[in-house]
Structures are given as C-alpha cells and as structure tokens.
A protein has these predicted regions:
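Conserved FAD-binding catalytic core of PHBH/FMO-like flavoproteins
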Residues: 67, 149-153, 158-270
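FAD/FMN-dependent oxidoreductases across multiple families
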Residues: 239-333
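N-terminal glycine-rich dinucleotide-binding loop that anchors FAD/FMN and/or NAD(P) in oxidoreductases
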Residues: 53-77
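Conserved Rossmann-like nucleotide-cofactor binding loop
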Residues: 21, 44, 172
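Glycine-rich FAD pyrophosphate-binding loop
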Residues: 30-52
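Conserved N-terminal helical subregion
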Residues: 8-9, 68-69, 79-178, 186-191
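C-terminal helical "tail/cap" subdomain of flavin- and related membrane-associated enzymes
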Residues: 318-411
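N-terminal Rossmann-like FAD-binding beta1-loop-alpha1 element of flavoenzymes
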Residues: 11-38
Length: 411
C-alpha cells in the first residue's frame, strides 16, 4: 500500500469513505486487480482508537465468507466470537424464539467482532496491496463527472481522477448529495445506547434480543466472559441515562440483563447514537455508485446494517469484474444498473422487516402483545419457517454474490 499525496492521482476507482464497508470494498476490488484510491476525513489512527467507536457488529455467516475470500478474516478470527444460538423474547413473556446453529449444521450463525478489531484487520490486509492508495485525513472539496470519467478534488489541492466513484461515506454522504440522489427518512425518536460488560457466567455463545416497550435490548456475546449491549431507548430519556454515575448506570444495565450472567460490570465507555431509517431512492448515477449506509441506514434491531453493506460490496465487485472481463466501461450506467437492480430488492425487504418489527414490538398494547407472542410460538413450531428466519440471520437467502459464498471470481 502506498500513501503518497501527488497533485494528481490517476486511479480506476476512487472510494470516498474509509469505514468498514469502504475498506472492504477497496480490498475486494484490489484483490481482483483494480487500482483503487480511498479517501477519508478521519485520521487512520483515530479510526482504530479504543475511544472512537464502542460498537461491535454481528457479522452474518455469509459476511464472514466474504472476509475469508478476500484475505481479511485471518486477522479478525482471534477477536471473533461465534454466535451459536439466538434467543428472542418479548419482555417478561416466557414465550421466545430460539435459533440454534446445529439445526442447519454448517457452522455458526455468525460472529460478533468489535468494530475496532475489524478496522485494524482491514488496515493490516490493506497494507499488503500496492494497488491501493489511502488518503487520510483528507476532505472532499468538489466532485465533477463527465463521459470521460470522474474527478474528486480534495481541500489539500490533490485531485483524484478515476473511471468510477464509490460513495461509502455514511448516512450524511457527500457523494450522494453531489449526485442529488433523493432519500426517504423515518425518525424513530429512539437512541441506541452502546457499552460492553464483563460478567461472572459464560454467555455460551448465545445472543439475546429482548423486546421492551422502549425498544429492543440486545445482549451480544464477545470473546471471553464479555458481551456488547445495545440498549434502545426513547430519545427524550437518553441524556438522563448517559449522565448517570457509573454506579447508577451499571445498576440499570444489570437490572435489564437480569441474573442469568451473574454479576456484571460495565467496562470502557458508553456511547449513544440516534436511530432512524434512511434509504436512497437510487444507488447509482453516471460513473457513481453508493454502498452501505450511504445507500441505506436501518434500525439496529436485526443487526444487519453492516451485513447489508458487505452484500453491496460483494455484488458490486462481481458486477465490475464481469464488466471488465468482456471489455465494458466499469463506470457505464448500464453496468452500474446491474448492481442497483441486484441489491435494491433485497435491501428494501430488510427495510420493511426491521421497520415493521420495531413498530410491532416497541409498544405494550395488550392485543398486539398477545398476537406477537403467539406468532413467535408458531415460528418455533413450524420448522421450514424457523429455518427461513435462521437463513436470513446467516445472510444466505436470495441470489448471493460468489464472494458471499466464499468463492473467488474468475478474472
């Protein structure tokens, strides 16, 4: 990997956004022979700092297959906790959904990895390529596109000329705004409070999701006797909770977990993030494509946010490799439309499911509560339906790109 800052850099693909999806895209593309430049406004050291992001991500089985195929997983594996079971409950109800990896019999449902360790692994793999340039910290000043290509001018004066621009720069995407791609937004008036805990008893690789009137409360297993918590709460209460003393906050956390993990202790910081649904009406424009949160940001209720972004990556890499093989322009709208058509339907289904589940479970109305409890009991008893939900959790439903099946692409 080279990190020089020339006045004009010529590259096949320029990526704005050096987060987890952006770096995965860079590696996937470079691993298949493309010359790639990545731009991010945050210094590399900050992206891997303990204080930058306290979140952990549930990586579906298919996402892990992708990361293995492009050589990232060996750097992540020591920090990855297999998810062997998922238990979903409706508040204090004794009825619950239970998903067990042994039912499908071909590996865990997924893995939990702290975002910091994922970023470190991605940077380690990035350094093995001489066809990736990383420009950071750099801020985009302007973007221009024409039939010949795209030019991204940075505030430092550096210009990056390329055939294709990828916007992987999050919900507030500069690239999406430049392309004037409209979005729809739903505000849930909820925040996700995130922290990690150490606990006395083993989690046994089980992920728990409890639906409470204020929103879901997730207990997600990490390596060792540790878990990551995602506590969804009504936005107007979040400042009060975040300002609690360490002892009072820990007491609230322990009360919500219950006693099954024994004594619990909050370790590290606590973070709060607003929760909303946002999706672009189109993922592509001339010589431009959106990936990940720049295209779609969803409720964390399903743990699928990063997985959707990695599916985008796998699909786009396959589309571009196929186009290059037959001599097509990788920035052509006809090529990029293949990517958009592949991903739009799958992503839209996830928007609808996560939005519906959040609305269905984030209340305590008696008849609705009874109906959803009976629904969970029915899913537990109907094996094909239960297996369908498990396959969704593993990311193995639908027309999967080859990389999500762990297969490399022919040049």
């Amino acid at each position: 990997m080279s990190a020089e800052k020339a006045k004009t850099i010529k590259s096949e693909i320029v990526i704005v956004g050096g987060g987890m999806a952006g770096l995965t895209a860079a590696i996937g593309l470079a691993d298949h022979g493309f010359d790639v430049t990545v731009i991010d406004m945050v210094p590399k050291g900050d992206l891997t700092a303990v204080s930058y992001d306290g979140r952990a991500s549930a990586l579906a089985y298919a996402s892990c297959q992708l990361l293995e195929a492009i050589g990232v997983w060996p750097y992540m594996a020591p920090y990855a906790q297999p998810i062997l079971e998922i238990r979903v409950s409706d508040g204090p109800s004794l009825l619950h959904l239970h998903f067990d990896n042994e039912t499908l019999g071909d590996g865990p449902l997924g893995h939990m990895v702290e975002n910091r360790h994922t970023r470190i692994a991605l940077f380690k793999r990035l350094e093995e390529f001489d066809n990736i340039r990383l420009l950071t910290p750099e801020k985009v000043a302007s973007i221009s596109r024409d039939k010949a290509g795209v030019c991204v001018t940075l505030e430092s004066g550096t210009r990056v000329e390329a055939d294709l621009l990828l916007g992987v720069d999050g919900r507030g995407s500069v690239v999406r705004r430049h392309a004037d791609l409209p979005t729809s937004n739903i505000e849930y008036r909820q925040h996700g409070i995130v922290c990690s805990v150490e606990h006395e008893h083993s989690h046994c690789g089980i992920a728990h999701e409890r639906f409470l009137p204020s929103g879901p409360f997730a207990i997600l297993p990490l390596t060792g006797n540790r878990s990551s918590l995602v506590w969804t709460e009504k936005s107007h209460l979040v400042d009060t909770i975040m300002n609690l003393s360490d002892r009072a906050f820990e007491s609230e956390v322990a009360r919500r977990i219950g006693g099954f993990l024994g004594e619990v202790k909050v370790v590290g910081g606590r973070w709060a993030y607003p929760i909303s649904l946002q999706y672009a009406h189109s993922y592509v424009s001339d010589r431009l494509a959106l990936i990940g949160d720049a295209a779609h940001g969803i409720h964390p209720i399903s743990g699928q946010g990063l997985n959707l972004g990695l599916k985008d990556v796998a699909a786009l890499v396959e589309v571009l490799v196929d186009a290059r093989r037959v001599g097509l322009d990788i920035g052509a709208t006809s090529v990029l439309d293949n990517y958009a058509q592949w991903r739009t339907t799958d992503n839209a289904a996830v928007y609808a499911i996560t939005d519906g589940f959040n609305r269905l479970f984030s209340n305590d109305i008696g008849p609705i509560k009874l109906a959803r409890d009976l629904g969970m009991a029915a899913v537990n008893e109907v094996t094909p339906l239960k297996n369908f939900f498990m396959s969704h959790a593993r990311g193995t439903v639908g027309e999967l790109p080859k990389l999500l099946r762990g297969e490399r692409l022919a040049p």
